[in-house]
Amino acid sequence: MLYSQKVAPYVFVLPFVISLLVFWLYPLISGIVMSFQDTSFGGSQWVGLKHYQKLASDKFFKTAVFNSVEYMLLTLLLLIPIPMMLAVLMESRLTKAKGVWKVIMYIPALTSVVISGMLFRLMFSEGDNGQMNQLMHLLGNASIPWLKEKTTGWIALLLLCMWRWTGVNMLYFISGLKSIDTSLYESADIDGANAKQKFWYVTLPLLKPTTIYVITISVYAGLSMFLESFMLWNGNSSPKNIGLTIVGYLYKRGIEKNDMGYACAVGMVLLIIALAINVVQLVATGTFKKEEK
């Protein structure tokens, strides 16, 4: 019995350890090794830093990095404050049928990105039949080639992003709000604090762990965005590469051109960029600081 009690915890953890090794550690190590190789179906050849040196002068890769970082920053500006405000509003006493609203807000996240991307592509089509151009006609304006210019194309992309992920981030913030002790708000009421002061001095500081978590996953999600852009522009063929992302370029080199070694180098640079940005934001937000006793 004593022996089985000692072994049982390891048995329960074993499936997770195996899945971690098979689906995370092994692909990561393989990707690192392949980034130093020319890999094809016929075999592999060690080329050292060739792919990384080539990346330094690859204008398409630089465009993809710029687009991905810009997209990530814009989504942070949109998908942190807006879901937070919606969560506060949802938890307000003034809001009725809270469960219904939560379901409605979360439904877009359950929708296939392939379907939602196609719908947004039709909505923002350059023809007169596109819903957005029909709206422009009602306002007395001419049709706009939405997806052919960066500004209008990115408006469509960001709207698609907000439509899909606002509800998800809102639920994260709602879970954070539920963990705040209501006695703190009661104390603030006794001190005569208004709604704005309670949000600024009670809600916002105590939502810090949730906010840091949402920022962290949003950084990774923003930098790894691919399918939304791929579906909105019907493939990796956006005008002037306005929709080309790092993962989109990885897909183009690895899948479309069968240059897996170069694609792995792209993936490793993406990993380094994502880790660097998140380490900076975690340090800036004081995540690694020890709490004072």
Please report, for each region that a protein language model flagged, where it lies by residue.
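N-terminal hydrophobic targeting signals that begin at the initiator methionine
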Residues: 1-3
